[in-house]
């Protein structure tokens, strides 16, 4: 009986189905990748718009538009109020003008009389004022031209000059002491302000350094978190690739299992038929050989017995030969019969083996169906788990990507804030340095101006004193040469400053 074989187109059909499934998987993976890319692009656009709408510039633009609209509304209300107020004032002014016109019409004569009285009063007041001025001028003229009063005034002037000079010296000393105290106070105030500014700058520098350290620590933590997220993303990508390889490996193992099951069925069928045929043939051959050996021993015993009895019973020898030949013929006939029976038995065994094989094949088919169903459920469950893990991996990658973008934006904002804080710190340092330099320059200018003014005052005082001494000497010399001459007009004497 020939062994069952499978058609050649089955294997080619299997390979075609396998390639088709692989292409379908690749198409499905590519579609999934395009869907993920489209999803990420959509989220990027959404995030950029969200950032733009929630940015400070958008907020300032909205608040500026709101304030402009509010100011326009307030201006419009104020303009309406002003118009209403002007309208009321115009009506009131018109009423007042009408009343005033009425009064003018009624009191024109009374007004002329009042004007005449006012003119007369003004004329009397001018006359009175002229009299007073004339009296005052006459008094001053008498006061200036009276010799006794002039001598008295000269004595008072000398006393005043002497007292004023001493007073001026005392005031000069007090002024110098006051200026020294003021300079000392200003120096102390300047030193205190400088110490306060230095302390404030130290505190600000410490605060800025602390903020820098905290910001650097935050940036370092964010960088570590970013590295961790990148490692998680790499791990998730590797895990996804591993899951895809496991999925392809399961499909390959399933295909190999089906092929091995078909090959095993063919091999088992051939092995069973061959083993059954060989076992029956060997067993029957041994039985025939044993029977032939038994028959041979029997015939040999008969022949030996015939030789022993040849001398005793010569008459019976022929009969023994005839019996031996007959037995040999019977054995040969029996051997032929056994061979025919063996052939018939072998044919019967093949049919029974075929029936047994068909029976076992049916049992194997049922068992194979059950095993295939169980394996299909197991493989389907495993594939479903792999797909769920792939989906979870995709979502985890999306979350990791979002968090990574958020961290990158936070890092950029941190860098911008650090740069802005650094620029503000530099500007503040420069402003404080310029302020201190301006204070120092102002203080030096004040000291220089005070010193210059003091020198000028001393020089003016010295020159005034020299000029006064020269004038006094010259006047004394002139008066001594001319003698006493009365003066008609005197002049106002003042003390030297």
From Swiss-Prot:
Stretches of the chain forming a coiled coil according to its record: 67-140, 166-271, 327-479
Superkingdom in the source lineage: Eukaryota
Modification note: Ubiquitinated. Ubiquitination by the BCR(KCTD17) E3 ubiquitin ligase complex results in proteasomal degradation, and induces ciliogenesis.
Signal peptide: none
Gene Ontology annotations of biological process type: apoptotic process; cell projection organization; negative regulation of cell growth; negative regulation of cilium assembly
Bias (Basic residues): 488-497
Pfam family, one: TPH
Family per similarity comment: Belongs to the TCHP family.
Record's function text: Tumor suppressor which has the ability to inhibit cell growth and be pro-apoptotic during cell stress. May act as a 'capping' or 'branching' protein for keratin filaments in the cell periphery. May regulate K8/K18 filament and desmosome organization mainly at the apical or peripheral regions of simple epithelial cells. Is a negative regulator of ciliogenesis.
Protein name: Trichoplein keratin filament-binding protein
């Amino acid at each position: 009986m020939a062994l069952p074989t499978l058609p050649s187109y089955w294997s080619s059909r299997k390979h075609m189905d396998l390639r088709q499934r692989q292409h379908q998987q690749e198409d499905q993976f590519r579609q999934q990748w395009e869907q993920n890319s489209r999803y990420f692009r959509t989220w990027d656009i959404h995030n950029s718009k969200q950032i733009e709408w929630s940015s400070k510039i958008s907020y300032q633009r909205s608040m500026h538009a709101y304030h402009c609209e509010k100011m326009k509304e307030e201006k419009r209300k104020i303009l309406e109020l002003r118009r209403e107020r002007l309208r009321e004032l115009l009506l009131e002014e018109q009423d007042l003008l009408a009343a005033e016109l009425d009064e003018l019409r009624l009191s024109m004569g009374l007004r002329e009389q009042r004007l005449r009285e006012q003119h007369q009063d003004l004329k009397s007041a001018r006359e009175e004022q002229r009299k007073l001025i004339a009296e005052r001028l006459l008094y001053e003229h008498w006061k200036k031209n009276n010799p006794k009063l002039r001598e008295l005034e000269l004595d008072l002037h000398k006393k005043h000059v002497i007292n004023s000079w001493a007073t001026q010296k005392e005031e000069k000393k007090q002024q110098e002491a006051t200026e020294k105290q003021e300079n000392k106070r200003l120096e102390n105030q300047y030193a205190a302000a400088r110490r306060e500014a230095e302390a404030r700058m130290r505190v600000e520098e410490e605060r800025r350094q602390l903020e820098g350290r905290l910001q650097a620590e935050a940036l370092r933590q964010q960088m570590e978190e970013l590295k961790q997220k990148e490692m998680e993303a790499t791990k998730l990508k590797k895990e996804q690739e591993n899951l895809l390889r496991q999925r392809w490996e399961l499909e390959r193992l399933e295909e190999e299992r089906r092929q091995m099951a078909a090959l095993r069925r063919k091999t088992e069928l051939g092995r069973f038929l061959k083993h059954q045929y060989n076992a029956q043939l060997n067993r029957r051959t041994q039985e025939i050989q044993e029977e032939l050996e038994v028959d041979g021993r029997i015939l040999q015993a008969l022949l030996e017995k015939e030789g022993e009895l040849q001398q005793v019973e010569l008459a019976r020898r022929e009969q023994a030969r005839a019996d031996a030949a007959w037995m040999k013929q019977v054995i040969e006939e029996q051997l032929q019969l056994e061979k025919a029976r063996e052939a018939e038995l072998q044919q019967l065994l093949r049919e029974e083996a075929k029936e047994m094989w068909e029976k076992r094949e049916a049992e194997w088919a049922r068992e194979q169906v059950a095993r295939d169903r169980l394996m299909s459920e197991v493989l389907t469950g495993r594939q479903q788990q792999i797909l769920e893990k792939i989906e979870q991996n995709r979502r985890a990658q999306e979350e990791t990507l979002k968090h990574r973008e958020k961290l990158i934006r936070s890092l950029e904002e941190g860098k911008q804030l650090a740069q802005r804080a650094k620029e503000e710190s530099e500007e503040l340092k420069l402003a404080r340095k310029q302020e201190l330099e301006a204070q120092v320059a102002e203080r030096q200018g004040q000291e220089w101006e005070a010193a210059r003014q003091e020198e000028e005052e001393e020089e003016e005082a010295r020159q005034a004193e020299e000029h006064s001494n020269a004038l006094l000497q010259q006047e004394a010399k002139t008066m001594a040469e001319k003698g006493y001459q009365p003066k008609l007009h005197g002049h106002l004497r003042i003390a030297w400053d």
